[in-house]
Amino acid sequence: MSSDHLRKIKFPCLIKPAQSHTYYEVFRKKMAVVNNLDELEVKFNECKKNNINVTVQEIIVGDICRGLNFNSLFFNGKIMQGFTAYKIRMTDDGYGIPIVVRGRRMIDELWEYSEKLLNKIGYEGYSCIEYKFDESDGLYKLLEVNGRYNRSSLLSVKSGINFPWIEYNYLIYNKDFAHKGYRKNIYYIDEFKDIQINIKKLLKGKQNLFPFLKPYFTTHVFAIFSIKDTKPFFKHILDGLIMMFSAKKSKFSNNNSTNRT
């Protein structure tokens, strides 16, 4: 990166990996916030040392709820089905993954932006494009394009748009489809992460009880629990217990080893 580029960077900003999983495997988080040029150099060199390609991304000012997902199926130069939701709660103080998301009405502006973008990059199929409304200039800013299904895709299914099933039938059986409406104001909840993060905030007085509970008492879909198939839910609990006891056992063994020394 040239010195001219460095001078144009506004701090704080984000160090963001080209491939999220490679960064997470090393640093156990999705990205890093840097506040000055020295921090940027340190974080960049850490990534370079671990052969992780990264980009520098501007931080868009605004609350978490200003972040939006635009899910769509794009074929033959146009969006054939769309779905919009906005973020309610996220991990890592708003820089991680969405753990509570709420479906909302379609935003025509995002439809137009997304169609132009997908045309330009020559992408076809399902995508989840993330935007954030910039309160400083009143414009939607592009964050990233995810060319894959993720767990929050369950929200669109619960709302009446089964993207995987529509795409499967289109690709395998050539079944055409047209955009249809969907139910709004349904919540997606990543129940384990939401409870883990926000119980701590509730105990410290950093989270109000009513806003925390509201999604659970409104129409919602969980990331893992389903009354139709409870095995993944109990498997997740079992895996968590195994990890917890393994960590305690490892800590106990290390303490004994230190004492013997």
What would you call each of these model-derived segments?
Residues 1-55, 76-78:
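Active-site nucleotide/adenylate-binding loops and adjacent lid/helix of ATP-dependent enzymes
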Residues 35-93, 105-115, 132-133, 139-141:
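Phosphate-binding site of ATP-dependent enzymes
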Residues 88-92, 97-99, 146-161:
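Glycine-rich phosphate/pyrophosphate-binding beta-alpha loops
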Residues 104, 108, 157-162:
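Short, conserved loop/turn and helix-capping segments at secondary-structure boundaries
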Residues 119-154:
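Conserved metal-phosphate-binding beta-hairpin within the catalytic cores
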Residues 149-150, 165-172:
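Internal helical hairpin/lid segments
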Residues 169-261:
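Peripheral (often C-terminal) accessory segments that flank ATP-dependent C-N-forming ligase machineries
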